[in-house]
């Protein structure tokens, strides 16, 4: 768990939701990608509830050192375990409730490890679906706004039925297409093996638990601001995207785990959180008392970047289930910068 009062406040906000935790009694819950931004906050949330509601929790990651650093605080929970494992490899493990958070999620890895980007969302997912299909629990596959591809110019915001353009004959398409295949694989297991699953499609995320090596533009802006540096913008900054603060994302994931309709996908985004990259860059520069500077990327770096220029999510469907985001963009940026500054 991060040693930061703002992170603990975020955790308390998530836990304040009235969710039917007792339905997890007797379950064994697995979180893959446990050391990532989403997985780590999800593990800390679940660990806070496991004793009172009688379920086991397994945090899985390829990085044992990070597991120990983040979660040794939970070692006093009798049913808590940390497992170092790559989901692409077969595993001798039985879990009936699974949150599949493991994935390459930033441009540098899309470019440098395109094979791993695809396999985690397909082969790793299949291994976990096989495990889940032998039980009667629920499976959560974290998908992404990236499944929509580029806006064709015919809508202002993507609902869950939208299908945009993806140039599939590129390295960068591996992330988008593997998330699409992953969703289809969940549907196949639901149809053929009766698996109960739900798919949150997350917008671009940020928050105190973000990794310091995250190469997404937004993450780099936040790190620049936390260090008191100029914000480095590697484009004109006119990309118009939806964003979501990490605690709102976890709140939505858990809400959909308990209340989402089986077999459905749901867009997840933040409170009043649709902005251009330039808007965010100038806001963070203002917070840090610095400036925005422009630095065009080289070819290798550019290969990992999204080509989308407008990716705004319509979250009417998830709101209809009773969930609402709580953290505004300005507040989320401020909280993230303050938290990151304490870690640097």
Pin down the residues of each PLM region.
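Conserved Rossmann-fold NAD(P)-dependent oxidoreductase catalytic core, especially the SDR/UDP-sugar
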Residues: 126-173
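Amphipathic terminal alpha-helices
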Residues: 1-22, 54-55, 329-344
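Substrate-positioning beta->alpha
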Residues: 174-177, 185, 198-199, 210-223, ...
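Glycine/proline-rich active-site loop of Rossmann-fold NAD(P)-dependent oxidoreductases
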Residues: 152, 180, 196, 206-219, ...
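N-terminal Rossmann NAD(P)H-binding glycine-rich loop of SDR-like oxidoreductase domains
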Residues: 28-48
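Mid/C-terminal beta-alpha module of Rossmann-like enzyme folds, strongest
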Residues: 259-302
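Conserved beta-loop-beta element that borders a ligand/cofactor-binding pocket
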Residues: 144, 183-208
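NAD(P)H-binding glycine-rich loop region in Rossmannoid oxidoreductase-like domains
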Residues: 84-120
